[in-house]
Amino acid sequence: MDMVENADSLQAQERKDILMKYDKGHRAGLPEDKGPEPVGINSSIDRFGILHETELPPVTAREAKKIRREMTRTSKWMEMLGEWETYKHSSKLIDRVYKGIPMNIRGPVWSVLLNIQEIKLKNPGRYQIMKERGKRSSEHIHHIDLDVRTTLRNHVFFRDRYGAKQRELFYILLAYSEYNPEVGYCRDLSHITALFLLYLPEEDAFWALVQLLASERHSLPGFHSPNGGTVQGLQDQQEHVVPKSQPKTMWHQDKEGLCGQCASLGCLLRNLIDGISLGLTLRLWDVYLVEGEQVLMPITSIALKVQQKRLMKTSRCGLWARLRNQFFDTWAMNDDTVLKHLRASTKKLTRKQGDLPPPAKREQGSLAPRPVPASRGGKTLCKGYRQAPPGPPAQFQRPICSASPPWASRFSTPCPGGAVREDTYPVGTQGVPSLALAQGGPQGSWRFLEWKSMPRLPTDLDIGGPWFPHYDFEWSCWVRAISQEDQLATCWQAEHCGEVHNKDMSWPEEMSFTANSSKIDRQKVPTEKGATGLSNLGNTCFMNSSIQCVSNTQPLTQYFISGRHLYELNRTNPIGMKGHMAKCYGDLVQELWSGTQKSVAPLKLRRTIAKYAPKFDGFQQQDSQELLAFLLDGLHEDLNRVHEKPYVELKDSDGRPDWEVAAEAWDNHLRRNRSIIVDLFHGQLRSQVKCKTCGHISVRFDPFNFLSLPLPMDSYMDLEITVIKLDGTTPVRYGLRLNMDEKYTGLKKQLRDLCGLNSEQILLAEVHDSNIKNFPQDNQKVQLSVSGFLCAFEIPVPSSPISASSPTQIDFSSSPSTNGMFTLTTNGDLPKPIFIPNGMPNTVVPCGTEKNFTNGMVNGHMPSLPDSPFTGYIIAVHRKMMRTELYFLSPQENRPSLFGMPLIVPCTVHTRKKDLYDAVWIQVSWLARPLPPQEASIHAQDRDNCMGYQYPFTLRVVQKDGNSCAWCPQYRFCRGCKIDCGEDRAFIGNAYIAVDWHPTALHLRYQTSQERVVDKHESVEQSRRAQAEPINLDSCLRAFTSEEELGESEMYYCSKCKTHCLATKKLDLWRLPPFLIIHLKRFQFVNDQWIKSQKIVRFLRESFDPSAFLVPRDPALCQHKPLTPQGDELSKPRILAREVKKVDAQSSAGKEDMLLSKSPSSLSANISSSPKGSPSSSRKSGTSCPSSKNSSPNSSPRTLGRSKGRLRLPQIGSKNKPSSSKKNLDASKENGAGQICELADALSRGHMRGGSQPELVTPQDHEVALANGFLYEHEACGNGCGDGYSNGQLGNHSEEDSTDDQREDTHIKPIYNLYAISCHSGILSGGHYITYAKNPNCKWYCYNDSSCEELHPDEIDTDSAYILFYEQQGIDYAQFLPKIDGKKMADTSSTDEDSESDYEKYSMLQ
């Protein structure tokens, strides 16, 4: 155990070190550098950026002509890009691609070919999210790092270890491994991505890789998928074409027993990039992007033609090495000749396309076995192909790899492509290659599963063993014998050797075994009842987890094991499943609890679910909660005892008491829904909507079978934002907690309270690549997935309160200014001066608008102009000039590069140029290292005299991207016109300037480390701590029952106002079921995308009490009736058909066990204020209503209500109907308060066990009871309708249908114990479900698909809990089981036939 922990810690430390080095950048690789670059190194770099060992010769006249021709083609390509929609499908595009794409526009061409910009717009910020997620959780970090260091290391871009391009390559591959976990990372991806990075920015290169791997035309997924359909299809084509064009080469390869086509195709892309010159690689890559996979086979054919003489002279081992690693070496033709032959070969292949076999489907790979060479006399002859061995049945046919047994001689090892030497292994009688082992090993074919390293034998491979370690060529793997009866085809694929998964990622023999499981007498393995796993049928862990949780609900399992469901199947329910769901689930439960099997395959149930819910078909991962809801609803409808559902009118509360509305709603629910699912899982919610206009309240009561609780902390977003002020002080980072639907206006308000700036002074901006990319609007919702990081800049406060994000006009009322110091007021504090020199205006005026106005204003106002979108400020970006080694024109020798944090510089129509320099210097001076003391006076004198070099930078007018001039036309290649440091006004007519740092000052004085220095406000730590702290289940329930305001998009239609109005909504728990299911909503839809919350929720395993969240009941209604587990007051005598109806419109705020209130609004008063004979009791004292002499003082009202006949209610009280008037209502309460207890006493006297027979109830009695807020009716209908259970009809049911009392010895408060948990680990796009459940033997088990292991309760992973299953304490399971005496079992023969027929079809399809 310690070794495993040490290994894990070492691996985590290694991941951390790798990420730290890439984050640190080039400095992390300095120790590995080989010293300074030698003089004249530029003469060793060719025009493609490849560094050669020797100095390159001068450019020849032919090469110069080629370069000039390429420059001439640039204008034609620019025209084509301008009219791309016209040319993108034309033959002219293909012709020009074969002629060559100019280097300077290869990036834009690739961008339009792969449609990069469109997918970027559809996925803003997605790359950054994937990159950060990859840093946290990617399992490919080590392998990516190993490949990055060897990718294009002879190129100047990738030469520096942890340099800029290596970092970009590493992050792209890391992000893609999370974006597409199915592919993850493969070695070839590093070479492909490196090519993209030569001409595309980092994010564009990422989306280029995404588009390429998703393109059906390029078929790259087939090279990396487990089934290898692309490679198989190309091989099928080559086996028809190449032998005709290169017969000698193919004969030589067959003679050596080597499948050369396979090896070459398996390594095609890597050889195509590494094996030839970069110039030719780029041109072939251009063609591949346009033509797609159809050029791959002609490229291989040309390579075979070039290599023919060398291949014919090479033996087997050398032949394999050359085909694998040196396939494209030493092309004997120049680039233009290769492209010319390629074009001709492609056209020829296109004409003969009809003679080729159809390509294999990508998802299935090749279904036909690969032909093997004929055998004669024990030696291999390559004169043709014999008939292929018989394959498996079509429904089970999957390719596998062939290999030699571990004890076979080294010479007899097959080639890595999978072709077996038949001189060592003769052909069996069935025509299937068998391995006649020299040392007496078992006969049969062999297959192996590849690992690059030798791992521990996984548990997935314990089926069909034995397995042996096997070492061959470049890989190590596990090998096992397979009998000839399997009749499975062989797979030739070399690069992905291994037993190929099915489409659902299961192993071939598992599906074959599972599909025939119903006909095979499997060996019975004794096990604990219920400790049986469920086989994963292809990403079905979500289904297995839900089934195991429901299966461990003991009353429901006993119901199915005893076969009671067969007596209650409802095959006529139009919204049911004709009994199929209940029948299949019952069969599965009986297998799970038989105690004879370690695992069961739920094929029939899965087929039934897929039939009625196609969304669960296929092999995609689904939500276990959605499956659970569908399963419970399906079981309920198939077992519903109501065969003809009556029409029920949905009524509004109309001010009626909650108790009355709740009883009516529950009664209506039971009239249509009565099953064991209702008895066990159904509760009732109270939903209240209050109109904010008139105060009208509408209340509804709805049933539920599980509670979906939001995670309160995840209803907030945690955001860290850096505030940069104008005074040049160190930036400060603040931590904010915002609502998920918060807008940027609310963000500014919170930030205002923390940083001391007014909202008008805060400018929010998204900073990316050292430039401002976007300004969020105030009315937009805050988004966490932005393209960069969010910053807040201080801007000069305008003279009138306007929105900085969308200014319309500015008031030019004067504002005081003293000595050129511009003052800012912040939250009522004293005016704070910012350091702007003399000459600044008294009012804030947009820069660049002076020419449009007279005296600077029009009627005291000045509108913003399009050329100056900012009010009173401009944006400055830091810039340095980088020398470019490859360029065509002299102005392109230096290219600008942005760095650091952009600045906000105050600027108006009155600002002088010198003021701009001073304002910039104030904000950047803290980044510059101070001058030595002896130079300080000289520097100050230079600044005073405004002489040439007084500032370490120069200001220039630039475009928004910071690369080109805003004044000069593009053909001048101007990088930005200089702004002189003078006294004249800075009329720049533009919103962006560049701060060009002088190279010497940048090197000697600029402190790069200071860029990342920020002061952290205490709110940052508070936000992080709140985000990481676990929450408890009570917090989730509190959030669920809290009041929320309905927004403008979901306005409520008020029946009183007769219009849609703003309203508030509140949910409350009214009735809790005996078995409570709690769903933690970890998956939430935020900012137009689904995300998973990893928040840890703490919950109780024992004695969980949710009664605090039940709607408080009026104590007068509870004094004689203990609370049921559903939170209702109920006298156990079976006299309630629709529950005791509450009289008061507003529930009392008191608890259930409090003394009677003295308030006149209560149903009954206490002893001191009650009418004569009116009883009063307190549960604390144990007193109750006086009973008759015949009643036992120790008898419980729960023992009542077992008579067959109907009950007669005694004549009590007035017959007046309840009034909504408070006066009438109170009078009704006083008149009937004492009579209610008399009613209970009379019932107690007549319905105790052994008591007298009851009398009948008259209609007038109903009226009397209703007048007092109650309705009692006979409930001897089985499982207690009045209790919320529904095992019988209302009224007219005999004692045969009744069951034992279900609520014996229940507590006043509902106390629950945990008995099952469904947990989800991983992320939204890829995760896994497991279940922890408590067995009747009081032991906990972990159900992980087919595995089931006992564990200690402390070992349960509660951090990943997703669905909780609680059981109320003190429940007798037998009370929920209906009596079946005298009932007829439903005929399930037709159901079985339908299920078996569909099951066979489903199995064949698998």
From Swiss-Prot:
Testis specific. Expressed in various cancer cell lines. GO terms for biological process: protein deubiquitination; protein modification process; proteolysis; regulation of postsynaptic neurotransmitter receptor internalization; regulation of vesicle-mediated transport. Residues 1129-1155 have a biased composition (Basic and acidic residues). It is found in: Cell membrane; Cytoplasm; Endosome. Residues 100-292 form the Rab-GAP TBC domain. Changing T150R: Does not restore GAP activity in yeast complementation assay. It catalyses: Thiol-dependent hydrolysis of ester, thioester, amide, peptide and isopeptide bonds formed by the C-terminal Gly of ubiquitin (a 76-residue protein attached to proteins as an intracellular targeting signal). The active site is at C541 (nucleophile), H1328 (proton acceptor). GO terms for cellular component: cytoplasm; glutamatergic synapse; Golgi apparatus; lysosome; plasma membrane; postsynaptic density, intracellular component; recycling endosome. Residues 348-380, 1120-1231, 1384-1406 are annotated as: Disordered. Belongs to the peptidase C19 family. The Rab-GAP TBC domain lacks GTPase activator activity but is necessary for interaction with ARF6. Deubiquitinase with an ATP-independent isopeptidase activity, cleaving at the C-terminus of the ubiquitin moiety. Catalyzes its own deubiquitination. In vitro, isoform 2, but not isoform 3, shows deubiquitinating activity. Promotes plasma membrane localization of ARF6 and selectively regulates ARF6-dependent endocytic protein trafficking. Is able to initiate tumorigenesis by inducing the production of matrix metalloproteinases following NF-kappa-B activation. May act as a GTPase-activating protein for RAB3A. PANTHER family: UBIQUITIN CARBOXYL-TERMINAL HYDROLASE, UBIQUITIN CARBOXYL-TERMINAL HYDROLASE 6. Interacts with RAC1 and CDC42. Interacts (via Rab-GAP TBC domain) with ARF6. Interacts with calmodulin (CALM1, CALM2 and/or CALM3); the interaction is calcium-dependent. This is Ubiquitin carboxyl-terminal hydrolase 6. It comes from Homo sapiens (Human).
